[in-house]
C-alpha cells in the first residue's frame, strides 16, 4: 500500500510527456538556429564618414534582394530633393566664405542667392517651382560653378553635381528615383543597419555602422562573431578635411582609423577586405590636375607605380600611380604589424557602379568563405 502514494496520475504522466516533447522541439529548434547562425557570413562595414558604406549596402539589395520597390523609391524623393537644397545652399554660402571669395558672373542673380540663403531649414521643406527656378539658374552661373570646383575647401556632399544636373527631372510631380539616384542619395547613417541577403544559397548579414567619430563607439557591439571586416575608403578624399573638425585630412583620418582597427586586440584574427572606393572621383581629380596628391602627402613625389600594377583599359598612368599609392599606404600598415593571423585584401571600387561592385563582391566571396571556415576551425 505504501507504493500507491508514489504512483502518478494519468494527467501528470500526460503533462510530463507533453513537457518532454516540448523540450525536444525547443532543443531541435535551437540546434537548427545554431546551424543557420554558424552557416551565416557576417560582414561588418567600417570606414570614416562619407566613404560610401551605405552605397555598398544598397548595391547588395540591388544585386541580391530584388532591389527597391516603387513604394521604397517614392520614400526617397524628399531625401533627394533635400540633397539638392543642401548642395546649392552650401555652394552659395561658400562663395562669400572662401579666400579669395567667388563672385557671380551675372550679378543680377544675387537676389536668387538671397532667396536660397533665407530658406527655412527643416526636413519636410516643400519645394516650390520658384525654388527650382532659382537653383537651376544659379547652377548655370559660371561663378557658382567656379565655387563648386573649389569644393575641397569646404564641406559639400559628393552627389551635389549629380542632382543639380537633374533638377528638371527631380522637380516633376511623377518623379520616381532610378537605382542610380538611390545609390547617389546621401543620408547620414546613424546607428547600425543590418541587410540580409543570399548568394548561391549562402546567407550573408551585412552590418552598416555610421562612420562619423561620435558613431564609432557603437562599433564594438558588432564585433562578436564577425566573419570579415569590409573597410571602405574614399580614395578621392586626399585633398579634403573631415566634417567633425574642419582640419584633419580625410584620407589621413581613414589611415588612422584603419590602423586602430588593424591593431585592435579583439580583431587580431579577423581579416579585412579593403574597398578603395570612389575611384571615379579620384580619376576626375587627378586628370583635372588642380589638386596634387604630393601637396597633401609629400611622400607621393617619390612614389613609383609598382611593376605588377594592372590599370583599367584606357586609364591615365597618373591615375594608376595615384590609386596604387593610396593602396600601398594602407598595405604598409597591415604588413608592418600583421602577425599572420589576419590579412588585408585590397580592391579598387566605385560604389555607384553596380557592375563594378558585382565583380568585386564575386571576387571576395572565396576569400569570405575561407575566413568563415577558419572562423569555425574547419580549415
Curated annotation (Swiss-Prot):
Region Disordered: start-end pairs = 1-25
Region of interest (G4 motif), residue spans: 273-280
GO terms (BP aspect): adenylate cyclase-activating dopamine receptor signaling pathway; sensory perception of chemical stimulus
Q: Where is this region: G5 motif?
A: 349-354
For membrane topology, the record states: Lipid-anchor
Q: List the residue ranges of the region (G1 motif).
A: 42-55
Q: What family does the database annotate? A: Belongs to the G-alpha family. G(s) subfamily.
Q: What biological function has been recorded for the protein in this entry?
A: Guanine nucleotide-binding proteins (G proteins) function as transducers in numerous signaling pathways controlled by G protein-coupled receptors (GPCRs). Signaling involves the activation of adenylyl cyclases, resulting in increased levels of the signaling molecule cAMP. GNAS functions downstream of several GPCRs, including beta-adrenergic receptors. Stimulates the Ras signaling pathway.
Q: How does it assemble?
A: Heterotrimeric G proteins are composed of 3 units; alpha, beta and gamma. The alpha chain contains the guanine nucleotide binding site.
Q: What is the name attached to this protein's record?
A: Guanine nucleotide-binding protein G(s) subunit alpha
Amino acid at each position: 500500500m505504501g507504493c500507491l502514494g508514489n504512483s502518478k496520475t494519468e494527467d501528470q504522466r500526460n503533462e510530463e510527456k507533453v513537457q518532454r516533447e516540448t523540450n525536444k522541439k525547443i532543443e531541435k529548434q535551437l540546434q537548427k538556429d545554431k546551424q543557420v547562425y554558424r552557416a551565416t557570413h557576417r560582414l561588418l562595414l567600417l570606414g570614416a564618414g562619407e566613404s560610401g558604406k551605405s552605397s555598398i549596402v544598397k548595391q547588395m539589395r540591388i544585386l541580391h534582394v530584388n532591389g527597391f520597390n516603387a513604394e521604397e523609391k517614392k520614400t526617397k524623393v524628399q531625401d533627394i530633393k533635400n540633397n539638392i537644397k543642401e548642395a546649392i545652399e552650401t555652394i552659395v554660402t561658400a562663395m562669400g566664405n572662401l579666400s579669395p571669395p567667388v563672385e557671380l558672373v551675372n550679378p543680377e542673380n544675387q537676389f536668387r542667392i538671397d532667396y536660397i540663403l533665407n530658406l527655412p531649414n527643416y526636413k519636410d521643406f516643400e519645394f516650390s517651382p520658384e525654388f527650382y527656378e532659382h537653383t537651376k539658374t544659379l547652377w548655370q552661373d559660371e561663378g557658382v560653378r567656379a565655387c563648386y570646383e573649389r569644393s575641397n575647401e569646404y564641406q559639400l556632399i559628393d552627389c551635389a553635381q549629380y542632382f543639380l544636373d537633374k533638377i528638371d527631372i527631380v522637380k516633376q510631380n511623377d518623379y520616381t528615383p532610378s537605382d542610380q539616384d538611390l545609390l547617389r542619395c546621401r543620408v547620414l547613417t546613424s546607428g547600425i543597419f543590418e541587410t540580409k541577403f543570399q548568394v548561391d544559397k549562402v546567407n550573408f548579414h551585412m552590418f552598416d555602422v555610421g562612420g562619423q567619430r561620435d558613431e564609432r563607439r557603437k562599433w564594438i557591439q558588432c564585433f562578436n562573431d564577425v566573419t570579415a571586416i569590409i573597410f571602405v575608403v574614399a580614395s578621392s578624399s586626399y585633398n579634403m578635411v573631415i566634417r567633425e573638425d574642419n582640419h584633419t585630412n580625410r584620407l589621413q583620418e581613414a589611415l588612422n582609423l584603419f590602423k586602430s582597427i588593424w591593431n585592435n586586440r579583439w580583431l587580431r584574427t579577423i581579416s579585412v577586405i579593403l574597398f578603395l572606393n570612389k575611384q571615379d572621383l579620384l580619376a576626375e581629380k587627378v586628370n583635372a590636375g588642380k589638386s596634387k596628391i604630393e601637396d597633401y602627402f609629400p611622400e607621393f613625389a617619390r612614389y613609383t607605380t609598382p611593376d605588377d600594377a594592372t590599370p583599367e583599359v584606357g586609364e591615365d598612368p597618373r591615375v594608376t600611380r595615384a590609386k596604387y599609392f593610396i593602396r600601398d599606404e594602407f598595405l604598409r600598415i597591415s604588413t608592418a604589424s600583421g602577425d599572420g593571423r589576419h590579412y588585408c585584401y585590397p580592391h579598387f571600387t566605385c560604389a555607384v557602379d553596380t557592375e563594378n561592385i558585382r565583380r568585386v563582391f564575386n571576387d571576395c566571396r572565396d576569400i569570405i568563405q575561407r575566413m568563415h571556415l577558419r572562423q569555425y576551425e574547419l580549415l
